[in-house]
Amino acid sequence: MRIENKQNKRQHHLLIVDDENNIRKILQTRLTLLGYSVSTACNGEEALKIFTTHSIDLIILDVMMPKLDGYGVCQEIRKESDIPIIMLTALEDVLDKVTGLELGADDYVIKPFSPRELEARIQSILRRIQTRNAKLKPYDNINLFKTGSLNIDLEKKQIYKNNELIRLTEMEFSLLELLVSQSGKAFSRSKILKEVWGYKLSKHEPIADTRIVDVHISRLRAKLEDDPTNPTLILTARGTGYLCRKLIT
């Protein structure tokens, strides 16, 4: 089912995937009131059908569902798209949380959750993407970097390794952009969460899970480094967080 607010000329189209009817209805109503166009699916197979026939900007994806679970949906979507995916999970085991991130999810929210928290996550991710796109100036050499077998073009959002195009998710690219554009500068995990994911990290905010950063760093290293176990581009700043080694444009 799709609901649109025609007053908003450029709506982001969200897909909510959850087998709990109450959750789908609550989120659809709240997100529609915020000006989003919303589609819903009650299982993984239905979600993939909607995804292939609509232009979706962000997916809210439950893990435990019939027919095809959230992990399977995430894997299928990542074969052809880098759109943001937020996982909803009632599983509190660390491995379960990390599994979704390793499969390509950008963030996760644990059930039961506050709708306001999820709304804030959605707004932060979409705002980050919009802000990044607005800031980049065309044909600006400062957005071009070459190191070893890598060519990084921040303006075109293209990364080539050995002349082969490397696909990154939106959040992977945002993380890489932060580190590369300020190469040589170390960022704490908390600072990365604030800059890339939009976490405010104030005393009123829920404590963010810094493993989100660690898993995304691992994913970037797996895609960009010749030897991910011995990285030469994205380095660990001992006692701090991460940094990109100093690059020259």
UniProtKB/Swiss-Prot annotation:
Keyword Chloroplast assigned to the entry: answer is yes
Q: Which GO terms describe its molecular function?
A: phosphorelay response regulator activity; transcription cis-regulatory region binding
Q: Which residues form the Response regulatory domain?
A: 13-126
- Record CDD domains: REC_OmpR (cd17574), trans_reg_C (cd00383)
| GO CC entries | chloroplast; cytosol; protein-DNA complex
Q: Which residues carry this modification: 4-aspartylphosphate?
A: 62
What this chain does, per the entry, is described as:
Probable promoter-specific protein mediating the interaction between DNA and RNA polymerase.
Q: What is this protein called?
A: Probable transcriptional regulator ycf27
Q: Where in the chain is the DNA-binding region found? A: 82-100, 142-246
